[in-house]
Curated annotation (Swiss-Prot):
Positions on the Cytoplasmic side per record topology: 1-12, 596-628
Superkingdom of origin organism: Archaea
The name this protein goes by in its record: Fusexin 1
InterPro entries in the record: Fsx1 (IPR049902)
Note on domains (UniProt): The extracellular N-terminus has 4 domains; the first 3 are structurally similar to fusogens from plants, C.elegans and viruses, while the fourth domain is unique to archaea. Domains I and II are discontinuous. The fusion loop in domain II is stabilized by a Ca(2+) ion so that it protrudes from the molecule.
Purpose of the protein: Exhibits fusogenic activity. Mediates cell-cell fusion in mammalian cells (bilateral fusion).
Underlying gene: fsx1
Chief location bin: other
Length: 671
């Protein structure tokens, strides 16, 4: 009692528990055993039960199979050891009796009934003719005699016999004396027995100290294998199967069943051997005894007595063999049921008992007491992640297993819902860190404030928990390129021209294109134009330089590099600009080609040779004078392309000013 008192002073928390007792019970009917204990290694403590809430005891028990009665005591110390807690009540399981038996069903057959007989005779005569007396004799026999050979025909020599004579002083009289037996009632219809079903009954009582015993009668004939039934309010039992004992179940090979309303009960198990003897007597001996009666060697009473003795023997209840101790459980002709109780156990039943520990077994288990003593939030940007932290202290005097998680966050803030579990000693503090994120569809730059909820509980008792709210802040990211215009489509039908603010976070609507209009890039800005003004039906999304305005002018593109058709232009002014580009490209090509020619001769040590770059010069000219033709040709081609497409970047007004300046410098002479 002192240990229990100290335990309660330490504020252990009562935990709802369920005792799950798995008992394999199989016994032979001899003695009554007391004190059959369960060893500690057969007890587990888990939190899985399909019938009751809370933790459960898993207590495995296997009977010693030496009795039909058992008294199993499960000490409180064994339960406490498995639960790692305190249990003050012992649990006892009493099987006050149990028996196993075989059940047989009756099956109708075409076997003949068992009849009682009466010996009869009659004299038939006529003065007409012998054929007439023969006809009258046969008619009488068919109406009164039993079909002994069972061929559905009443025949002389098989089913009846006769004496025939003729007499008369004045006229002839034809006489016939007929001898046979007829039915004088029957004992019943014959049926076969089906193969047996193994069944059991057990009187079970489960009791915890100081509680009302829970008891019932269990039988698989009511439950069915794997099914469960209640034993009172707090106990549930499941039958899980039958283990064979090694003893065979009697098969109904040597017996039949006979049904008659004159029997009590109406079904009776009879000997198959006696039934066969009765049939053999009728088929092989009854006719010869009728002949003996006709000849006078047997009396009429002796024939009847012998035949009816055979029938009575066949209809008697079986008196030897395995089926002497049976019970009729259903007397109806259609659903006859025979129960056989052998003198030995034919199987051992196995049970699983579920005992509600919350109300029936007191279990006290030490758990921790979590308290959140501090929380820390975080500030982070959009599409980034931050960390929230909770510091948790165990304020109990016992070790706790604390599980923490983020249960919810404000809108637009995401979180990882997985929980983290840590073991915390008495008075210790641990930290839990959780990742949070932020995502928004808004264009407005702003700081968004929110919060997340953190929940911590002890895994041994979820009611021991604490909750705290932590603040979080997130900053909206840029949504566009500062000071640039761009186009968005409204409902896939209309273009909307927007201008990005200087901070890249907000936009201003510039224009919305109407029906039949598209957004096109013109003179370094976006504008709405009619569909027909776009070459090739394009959307006018070209760049802002002096090149073409549509993608129709692009003949080659790799990444951001695009090469346009030099003769593709939007208007005469752009065509004039491209003509200047051709002139500039050609000039640059000849200049760089000459430079490449000179460089090639310099490399060959021919820098003192005079002459110009003329790739079409006669082949008789020395190789040294020709220089490196291939190098010069490649340099010329590259220079032309560079000259043409570099000049494309120069606006046309700048090109005109350069040309005008060159002309003035070349041809103008001041006074």
């Amino acid at each position: 009692m002192r240990a229990v008192s100290d335990f309660l002073k330490n504020k252990w928390v009562a935990v709802p528990a369920v005792a799950l007792l798995i008992l394999s019970l199989g016994f032979l009917a001899q003695n009554y055993i007391t004190g059959s204990f369960v060893s500690g290694d057969q007890i587990e403590y888990t939190s899985n039960s399909e019938f009751f809430d809370g933790e459960v005891f898993v207590i495995n028990y296997i009977g010693d199979r030496t009795t039909d009665k058992i008294h199993a005591e499960i000490p409180a110390s064994e339960l406490a050891s498995a639960a790692d807690g305190e249990v003050t009540k012992e649990l006892t399981i009493d099987i006050t009796s149990q028996e196993t038996y075989a059940r047989y069903s009756t099956t109708s057959t075409s076997l003949s009934r068992i009849y009682a007989f009466k010996a009869i005779n009659s004299e038939v005569f006529t003065d007409t003719s012998s054929s007439e007396v023969e006809s009258r004799k046969q008619s009488w026999a068919e109406q009164n005699c039993y079909d002994i050979d069972g061929d559905s025909e009443i025949e002389q020599g098989d089913d009846y016999t006769q004496r025939f004579w003729v007499d008369g002083a004045i006229a002839d009289y034809y006489n016939a004396q007929v001898y046979c037996v007829r039915e004088n009632g029957y004992y019943g219809n014959i049926a076969e027995l089906s193969s047996p079903d193994k069944e059991f009954e057990a009187e079970v009582e489960v009791k915890a100290d100081g509680e009302t015993p829970q008891s019932t009668t269990l039988s698989n004939s009511d439950l069915g294998q794997g099914r469960c039934d209640n034993i009172g309010e707090y106990v549930r039992a499941c039958w899980t199967g039958l283990n064979p004992t090694g003893e065979g179940v009697p098969e109904p090979y040597n017996v039949y069943a006979i049904h008659s309303n004159t029997f009590s009960p109406e079904w009776r198990v009879i000997s198959a051997e006696r039934y066969s003897s009765y049939n053999s007597y009728v088929e092989n001996n009854l006719y010869s005894q009728i002949e003996a009666w006709k000849e006078g060697s047997l009396s009429q009473e002796e024939v009847v007595s012998t035949a009816n003795d055979q029938a009575a023997q066949a209809a008697q209840r079986v008196s030897s063999g395995s089926f002497t101790d049976y019970q009729v459980e259903d007397s109806s002709y259609e659903n006859g049921q025979i129960r056989l109780n052998p003198s030995y156990d034919i199987a051992w039943p196995e049970f699983t008992f579920y005992v509600d520990g919350a109300d029936y077994i007191s279990v006290e288990k030490p758990v921790g007491e979590p308290r959140i003593v501090n929380v820390e939030g975080d500030e982070f940007g959009e599409k980034q992640s931050g960390t929230v932290t909770a510091e948790v202290e165990n304020t109990a005097s016992y070790e706790g297993s604390f599980s923490a998680r983020v249960s919810k966050c404000s809108d637009s803030f995401g979180y990882d819902s997985l929980q983290e579990t840590k073991t915390v000693g008495p008075g210790e503090t641990v930290s839990f860190d959780f990742r949070v994120s932020f995502t928004s569809d808004s264009f407005d730059q702003k700081t968004v404030s929110g919060s997340c909820e953190i929940v911590v509980s002890d895994t041994g008792d979820s009611s021991n928990s604490d909750t705290a709210v932590v603040d979080v802040e997130a900053t909206q990211s840029n949504e566009c390129t500062p000071n640039e215009e761009f186009v968005r489509t409204i409902n896939s039908t209309h273009s909307r021209i927007l201008e990005c603010s200087s901070d890249g976070l907000t936009t201003t609507e510039v224009d919305v294109c109407g029906d039949g209009e598209e957004a096109a890039f013109r003179d370094s800005s976006w504008t709405c134009v009619s569909d027909g003004t776009l070459p090739g039906g394009g959307d006018g999304s070209g760049g802002s330089g002096g090149g073409g305005d549509t993608d129709d002018c692009v003949v080659f593109a790799v990444g951001d590099l695009e090469i346009e058709d030099p003769f593709c232009a939007d208007g005469p002014l752009e065509m004039l600009s491209k003509m200047f580009h051709l002139v500039a490209g050609t000039a640059v090509a000849f200049f760089t080609g000459s430079l490449g020619y000179r460089a090639g001769r310099w490399v060959d040590g021919e820098y003192q040779i005079k002459g110009g770059f003329d790739p079409l010069k006669s082949r008789s000219v020395s190789r040294a004078k020709r220089g490196r033709f291939l190098i010069g040709l490649i340099a010329e081609l590259v220079s032309f392309l560079l000259g043409f497409y570099v000049i494309l970047l120069v606006p046309i007004w700048a090109q005109l000013m350069v040309i005008l300046g060159y002309v003035l410098f070349k041809y103008y002479t001041p006074f």
